């Protein structure tokens, strides 16, 4: 027997009467994308080797050789010197082959009590756990940038919209804090998902467990897992944790996409609420005047990409019988790309938000259009004893009259207002105009969750405290 796995087939070649087709080698190889698991693969192997030695399954000398060889391999990978071989199919066999070349028979003993089925499941969980932590930090960075911008604009008034029609005045700070809430829930989902990712599959072997006297709990403790997967079949075959992460990521990107849609709209010259820093925009190859919000536009597009990965993983798993099937090799590229897309998007958005220039005059001018304080007039009448439905009808009549005349409700004199609303004229006094100002409207929503500037400042304080936890 040779001292090294020179080719993939040498891991099982005694069973077959002809070599593997070159086309099949290329078709089934995953090393050029799963090699990003190399460092966690080494970490898992070292934990496994230490357990084998502690259980007297391999010798202390074998363990020392494995640790020495893995240290060299890790250095080669980190320096970009490791030679990845297509013939060895995947990250696991590439590392095992190199280890065996370096230390001989001790390298062959590493795989005792282990299958690539539980090995790869462990690698993915180890890797994903770290990426979830990284994404959690990036979500916090974006939340922090939004909180800072909200605090700066606690008093900045803009129109709030429903159906993209002007609805009621809100503060820009309040609007931004809505996204803070969304991204806070995203961070909570990531933390919750992590609890199910953080279970150790190693020890399940191919599907049924192993006859060696292994200590799975010791390996779990070494690798920082909260516990072990309780069923060997489930441990090697399911990828629901990856699906759950991708679903949580799709929600992150959905929230990013909604925010992107508004950024594109707000930056449009027709709206002009904000400006995005030049370093996040591009120009046109033909139109010299253009400044295009490519980053938020591309984020909208990349949301579809992540949603597609979620569908790919769901479809991948839906038809598989227990236990492991080769189909599961296709779990990695959607998962890897989801992580890359979400992480890159969050990082660039945190930087972009910090560089947004707000145009409060344009926001205020827009809030003065579309009768945004009509509800405040209705509330004014209700507080004087008129049933809300009657108040609603009376104000709708006044809005129509003002719309026909091309003026706002606040432009009516007191006499004109009483004349146009004869049925409620006795309820209208000089104080009505305080209700029709933008400042009066937002200030009146002075309750937790409301848009009043004082509430926005309180919400900013609470959000910042939550971020510090």
From Swiss-Prot:
Q: Which GO terms describe its biological process?
A: arginine biosynthetic process via ornithine; L-arginine biosynthetic process
Q: Which UniProt keywords apply?
A: Amino-acid biosynthesis, Arginine biosynthesis, Cytoplasm, Lyase
Keyword Cytoplasm in annotation: yes
What's this protein's name?
Argininosuccinate lyase
Family statement: Belongs to the lyase 1 family. Argininosuccinate lyase subfamily.
Extract the NCBIfam families matched here. Answer: argH
Record HAMAP family? Arg_succ_lyase
Instruction: Show the InterPro entries listed in the entry.
Output: Arg_succ_lyase_C, Argininosuccinate_lyase, Fumarase/histidase_N, Fumarate_lyase_CS, Fumarate_lyase_fam, Fumarate_lyase_N, L-Aspartase-like
- UniProt GO MF annotations: argininosuccinate lyase activity
Instruction: Quote the Gene3D superfamilies the UniProt record gives.
Output: Fumarase/aspartase (C-terminal domain), Fumarase/aspartase (Central domain), Fumarase/aspartase (N-terminal domain)
Q: What is the lineage of its organism?
A: Bacteria, Pseudomonadati, Pseudomonadota, Betaproteobacteria, Burkholderiales
- Chief location category: cytoplasm
Q: Name one Pfam family in it.
A: ASL_C2
Can the keyword Lyase be found in this entry's annotation?
yes
């Amino acid at each position: 027997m040779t001292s090294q796995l020179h080719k993939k087939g040498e891991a099982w070649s005694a069973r077959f009467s002809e070599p593997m087709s070159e086309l099949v080698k290329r078709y089934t190889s995953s090393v050029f994308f799963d090699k990003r698991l190399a460092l966690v693969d080494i970490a898992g192997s070292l934990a496994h080797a230490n357990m084998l030695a502690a259980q007297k399954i391999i010798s202390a000398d074998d363990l020392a050789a494995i640790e020495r060889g893995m240290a060299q391999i890790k250095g080669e990978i980190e320096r970009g010197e490791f030679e990845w071989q297509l013939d060895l199919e995947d990250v696991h066999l590439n590392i095992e082959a190199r280890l065996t070349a370096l230390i001989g028979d001790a390298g062959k003993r590493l795989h005792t009590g282990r299958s690539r089925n539980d090995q790869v499941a462990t690698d993915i969980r180890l890797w994903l756990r770290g990426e979830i932590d990284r994404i959690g930090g990036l979500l916090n960075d974006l939340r922090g940038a939004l909180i800072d911008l909200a605090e700066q604009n606690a008093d900045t008034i803009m129109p709030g919209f429903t159906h993209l029609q002007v609805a009621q005045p809100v503060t820009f700070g309040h609007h931004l804090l809505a996204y803070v809430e969304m991204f806070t829930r995203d961070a909570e989902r990531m933390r919750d998902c992590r609890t199910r990712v953080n279970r150790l599959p190693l020890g399940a072997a191919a599907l049924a467990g192993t006859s060696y006297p292994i200590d799975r709990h010791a390996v779990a403790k070494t690798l920082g897992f909260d516990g072990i997967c309780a069923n060997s079949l489930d441990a090697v075959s399911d990828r629901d944790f990856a699906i759950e992460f991708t679903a949580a990521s799709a929600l992150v990107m959905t929230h990013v996409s909604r925010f992107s849609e508004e950024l594109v709209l707000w930056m449009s010259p027709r709206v002009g609420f904000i400006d995005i820093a030049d370093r996040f925009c591009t120009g046109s190859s033909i139109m010299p005047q253009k400044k295009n919000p490519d980053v938020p536009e591309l984020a909208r597009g990349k949301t579809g990409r992540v949603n597609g990965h979620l569908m790919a993983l769901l479809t991948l798993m839906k038809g598989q019988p227990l236990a492991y099937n080769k189909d599961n090799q296709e779990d990695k590229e959607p998962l890897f790309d989801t992580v890359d897309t979400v992480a890159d998007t969050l990082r660039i958005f945190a930087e972009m938000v910090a560089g947004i220039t707000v145009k409060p005059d344009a926001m205020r001018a827009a809030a003065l259009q579309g009768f945004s304080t009509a509800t405040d007039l209705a509330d004014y009448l209700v507080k004087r004893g008129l049933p809300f439905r009657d108040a609603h009808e009376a104000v709708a009549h006044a809005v129509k009259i003002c719309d026909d005349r091309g003026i706002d409700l606040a432009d009516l004199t007191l006499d004109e207002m009483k004349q146009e609303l004869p049925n409620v004229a006795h309820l209208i006094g000089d104080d009505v105009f305080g209700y029709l100002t933008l400042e009066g409207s937002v200030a009146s929503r002075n309750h937790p969750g409301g848009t009043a500037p004082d509430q926005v400042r309180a919400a900013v304080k609470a959000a910042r405290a939550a971020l510090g936890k």
